[in-house]
Amino acid sequence: MRGLYVHVPFCLSKCPYCDFYSERYSRALGERYKEAALRNLRFYNERFDTVYFGGGTPILLAREIVGILSEASLTAGAEATVEANPCVSDEERLFLLFSGGVNRISFGVQSMREEELRFLGRRHTAKQAENAILCAYKAGFRNISADLMIGLKNQTKASVSESVRALSSLPITHFSVYLLKIEENTPFFRDGVGVMNDDEAAELYLFTAEFLEKSGFCQYEISNFARTGYECRHNLKYWRCEEYLGIGPSAHSYYNGKRFCAARDLNAFLKEERQEITVTDEAAGDFEEFAMLRLRLTEGLSFADCARFGISAETLLRRSEKIPSEYLRVTESGISLTARGFLVSNALIGRLLGY
């Protein structure tokens, strides 16, 4: 069954490292956005088992999100996620979301150290992040995720472990860990902000992965860790090459065998009967794409899956012979990358694909 992604492109302010499409939040636009999203959704006679509201800062439109959910066709037990910034995650919004059908909340915490939060241009403090998480739990959420940013210049293992300890003492069930990357057309890029060198960043990534594992969060994807049973079902669709529909400015879709994206234009989305899309791949889902996505997961690539594409286990094993075991696991049923292998995944995947 397909998943639904809804891009909510509103923020109070733009973080200096972020290159996702967003516009300044205006309460007056909320109702218009909801109607545009529903208008587009009605073009598809679909039932979804996951829905993910990403942004932007979707929680700003809590009431509108509940309105969209009330009209969307979801299966019983569907996973419904909303991304949230701790500084606007008040009791009213969180209770409204949970009572309206949202059962998973993802907080953009990034760090529990004040100096790192200031550097990243975040509007919240560590205390606000803690309060937001506890408030979400009080509202009824039992599936709570936190984003963590690593690779900041001068960041240390001690500072990362401080953030992980602080967050894992709270009712968190999931972590997404991202290495800071300086993207073009961001203030960090224009200001020449530096990041850790590759070797330091790799060492910090491996440390963080190990520390999270010891704290009870199992790695299931390059950047994602979860307590047992709390993996993000929606995001697993991306990595398992399953189809999903994207609604909203800049939203991407994999639908009916094609990949396409919506225009990065809020005004057009609000005005037009149907969102403008650009097809990026007419025949998505070939073996190369499938393998690249599956090898992001610790479950890896099974020989049975390869056989569906006409790739034999013998071919894959032959290509993997010279890859050291510290980078690649080989079992009777398939292959997968280790945490160290994830750091050089592009090179390893290229070798496995026969490049």
Residue map of PLM features:
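C-terminal scaffold of the Radical SAM
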Residues: 1, 22-44, 49-311
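Minor-groove-contacting beta-hairpin "wing" of winged helix-turn-helix DNA-binding domains
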Residues: 334-338
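Immediate flanking context of iron-sulfur cluster ligation sites
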Residues: 1-8
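Short amphipathic alpha-helical interaction segments
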Residues: 310-324
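Local cysteine-cluster metal-coordination motifs and their immediate loop/turn environment
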Residues: 9-20
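A short, conserved structural fragment
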Residues: 324-333
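Short, flexible helix/strand-to-coil boundary loops that buttress conserved ligand/catalytic motifs
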Residues: 19, 121, 349
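Short, amphipathic alpha-helical interaction segments positioned at domain boundaries
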Residues: 340-355
